[in-house]
Amino acid sequence: MKIQTTLLTVGLLSLPISATLACDAPETPEVPNGETASLEAMIAAQTEVKTFQASNAEYLACVDEQMATEQNLVDEGEEGAQERYALAAADYNAAVSREEQVAADFNAAIRAYKAANPD
């Protein structure tokens, strides 16, 4: 029984945090090289970035809800809730950082595109 419990615990810990939270993180879009991309590629990338940002907002709301639930469980003294809360908070912060990086990369691509295509 102890081995089964240990295996189950190890298995659960190896799951990505989004799987344990029932929140699906959006895929990060690829940003084209602005120096060589066509206008059509830049417009398509802009659409993908906007879609990513909207999906990420939904994801952050989901993680935020899970964090609130875990905080309530922490307040009730449930074992393991503090660790789950910390994992959710780290996941939330990583998603915010990922979105900031996508925005920075896309803005850099726009500047590079404009520099390469001054028309």
Please name every model-derived segment.
Residues 2-22:
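Classic N-terminal secretory signal peptides
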Residues 16-17, 56, 100:
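Processing junctions and N-termini across compartments
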